[in-house]
Amino acid sequence: MAAIKLLVLSLACACVIAHSPIPPASRTIFLDERLEGGAFENIDAFENIELSNVVASPYRLPTTTVPTHYKILWIIDIHQPVQTYSGNVVITLHATQAQVNEIVIHSDHMTLSSVVLRQGDTVIPTTPTAQPEYHFLRVKLNDGYLAYNADNAVLYTLSIDFTAPMRDDMYGIYNSWYRNLPDDANVRWMATTQFQATAARYAFPCYDEPGFKAKFDVTIRRPVGYSSWFCTRQKGSGPSTVAGYEEDEYHTTPTMSTYLLALIVSEYTSLPATNAAGEILHEVIARPGAINNGQAVYAQRVGQALLAEMSDHTGFDFYAQDPNLKMTQAAIPDFGAGAMENWGLLTYREAYLLYDEQHTNSYFKQIIAYILSHEIAHMWFGNLVTNAWWDVLWLNEGFARYYQYFLTAWVEDLGLATRFINEQVHASLLSDSSIYAHPLTNPGVGSPAAVSAMFSTVTYNKGASIIRMTEHLLGFDVHRTGLRNYLKDLAYKTAQPIDLFTALESAGNQAGALSAYGSDFDFVKYYESWTEQPGHPVLNVQINHQTGQMTITQRRFDIDTGHSVQNRNYIIPITFTTGANPSFDNTKPSHIISKGVTVIDRGVVGDYWTIFNIQQTGFYRVNYDDYTWNLIVLALRGADREKIHEYNRAQIVNDVFQFARSGLMTYQRALNILSFLEFETEYAPWVAAITGFNWLRNRLVGKPQLDELNEKIVQWSSKVMGELTYMPTEGEPFMRSYLRWQLAPVMCNLNVPACRAGARAIFEDLRVFGHEVPVDSRNWVYCNALRDGGAQEFNFLYNRFKSHNVYTEKIVLLQTLGCTSHVESLNTLLTDIVTPNQMIRPQDYTTAFNTAVSGNEVNTRLVWNYIQANLQLVFNAFASPRTPLSYIAARLRTVEEVVEYQTWLNTTAIQSALGTNYNAIYGDSVATYNSILWVSTIEDSLSTYLTNGNDVIEPSTSTTSTTAAPTTVTQPTITEPSTPTLPELTDSAMTSFASLFIISLGAILHLIL
């Protein structure tokens, strides 16, 4: 082992001394992709490491004892100058095997004043010991073992007194402040919780893993004048034995995991819905200033409808899950998680729950609806049936994300089935295209940090996409039957993926839904091919239009190289249709392929376009031979465009952008295909285009091709913007309004005169005459007024932010204030972000700071100057200094800027301030360097198209007939993208890369040694 370390260290030293040439930088997944994403998204940092040879994690609790019941008293001192919580927990537990002499549970950041183990009334002498590195409390018997009986468990009780200061980091039991109305001078404090994934151990000693389910009886002691809420209905309330307090006792919970508990102590008001007996079944609670202004009405209506719809869909009524359950939706002023599915007490940021018809735009309206749906779906997928461990978190979050869209679509007309394509399928295909992407089922997750990393785009978005693919494989009714059986069989238990697979397979077999796929089709292996291995395939389709023979080669897609060297085969459901008889309605697969090369008979001969993956139900990309691409382009530019499903047009846009980025296709070819956007007016293709163009435009800043590309985008968007116009029309469909909300800011960024002038005029109408800007136009109107204005415009909007009572409007303002380039105004904003002054909330620091950097192209330098002048103040505001610095690194535009930034990082004072974060922060600058170098490899191809325009493609005609595919086929030659030659690095850059190499080498050593 020592010899290996010495050898590697010697190699590393040799690299530094010799300044050996660095291989061309081919990494094209860049830092800013971690920063681009909507609310409630979990954007991967592409830093997950595939784990193998997994051993039991030292962070996992032993299963030698298990709890059955907790009795908890929480004492919440939210009204005191020093805010604390304390209490007592009595855990009923038993041994699961003989010769157990130690009980191991979780406890962290608490003072324990008493730890007593009893069997009945007999005290068992023990020695408690803390093991803080694993958050463990070890209670060792001084003599003998716990009694064990396999047939009749011998019960013990472990009683622990605890106390802790109220947290302020939005984990465990923490404090939050609010004003009933913005001009209220009286700041009010409340206590609330966030336990997922590993923070229940901050609130009380417990078995803080999802697999240790138990029942809970809870009493909350609170100050007089406050109210409390818990997961279940209140059993009773009365004076405490301690003066100035009252105690609320709650009914027993269902059998549940610790991370799903929650409590609130506040002076909130409720908007209730009761049954005939007057019992509250569903309520929304929030600060009185929001409830009294009607901001809870929308969530109350939609929440009840979603709960009823999900109860019907699952065949398992929510209120039948346990007689003590009710549904409370709570708006929390400070809430880092966004929303949380605590069983019966769901918690949300205000912006994700409270709706005001005059001041909440369509974006936040749909967020409120679909986050309600996500959390309500968890009552079944996550709460009733829980992932056995966080390595299969997709069993919880994949289904919640799936129903976030489709459950909402059954209740509200918000275009969510369409938007699933852009927001879930396309987003997860990108995250999953890195060689570092983790599989959905990811053994080896142990530490709290590793658990946190599982809350990723792959887990949420890919999980939901694979579930959708499987639903189309089985059919909706069969899929629902299988899910109902899964929930029924595993209610109040934990689940592994095989439990889901067998339930769905059984339903499929009983209904005959799997017979069409042949006797060799193994449903479990199909599902495992998508959950147990990372990545996804690109299908390379070559069509002989004279014979109808289609040769399909699958390769794992790699965003950096096109085809991954880590090739894998997936079991892929295939659908396709042709121009001979186009049909995009039947999404049931016609073929299942699992081999590297497969031949399929198209069924017709002749020059007909062919499109695979109908409605993009499958989780894969499709690349065609050049001739077939030409036929598709002709169709998209002509009358056949309307025959091709909107989702498939969006699929083509997204695929083509990623093929060009990875080198599977030139940008000249890609833009030829994308030229059909000139005639496109639908939502999904244009949102896919916006995403692709924004990514490319960010990399072309300072390049001559940027202005030419901008002109082309304006040209192509003239038809859709001509139909939409810049102002909403009364009664228009939601998706038209939402497309305008997406496109209008882009038009202003492209300096379209109608947009810039319109924004200025609308803003002045607000500032001078008080006429409100239409809610769906405020994002682009505010931003462009600030870009074109100065201190006057900034002060007007900042005062509006400070005084507004609707949090969704405050967020829109916070997201646009950074558009100012006025230095003093920008510095005012930055100071209020990083100074604890109850002006901007900690949960919004990252949003506000990122907007300050990215809201205006000139701001990167201004914000970096501010950071350098206020280093400690900025670093203190964030959990990690990497957060604010990553925003700077992502927007450096030239090699000179990167080198200047790296030189600053390498100063002794900055390295000392960054500490252990230095390596990651320096690595961010290297990622940006790679981005700059990558652009040089595509400039010629881009320029060729922008200069010459579209290729001329001549249509051809032929007759239709059927033909059988040949019985054998020669595997086609796959053209690999060439590795581009990048500019040589400067000495400074070479030293930087050498340093990064050593950092990476150290990480590898840590893993393998």
Swiss-Prot record:
Binds 1 zinc ion per subunit. Substrate binds at residues 338-342. The keyword Metal-binding applies. One of its GO terms (biological process) is peptide catabolic process. The record marks 460 as: Transition state stabilizer. Residues 1-15 form the signal peptide. It is a lipid-anchor; GPI-anchor. Its cofactor is Zn(2+). Transmembrane segments: none annotated. Coiled coil: none annotated. It is found in: Cell membrane. Glycans are attached at residue 906. Binds to the B.thuringiensis toxin, CryIA(C). Belongs to the peptidase M1 family. This is Membrane alanyl aminopeptidase. It comes from Heliothis virescens.
